[in-house]
């Protein structure tokens, strides 16, 4: 069975992007907010300061040495290197490795990863999110993956929302 996470980018500032995330049935309505680095023009990447391009990505589980726990990871392909799996996103002529979904509060915590939280503050120079939803999201999505289901993360750039 295939499950799709809907990630809708709606608010944009020079250094950060704020989105709403919706989970597959049986969850109804917005699950939380995603904070990322800025969205750039197609094919443009500034390392650690660029959101991944809009599109569809596979979702997997990976142990993070930085966080010392399993986390969700987005990818378009997996490269085996010296016994390790490298999760890579290649799209529009640019690539990203280890795009994780984890907690954080500002775009400074992102480095191209997706930060998930319950609350968002849109005032101020940059977006701020609070109340991590990482554990809840991991529990839901990992249960699908552990059951052998496919999970797709679909990102859409919508027009700026007021």
Segments and roles (model prediction):
Residues 1-151, 155-162:
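Cell wall/extracellular polymer interaction/catalysis modules
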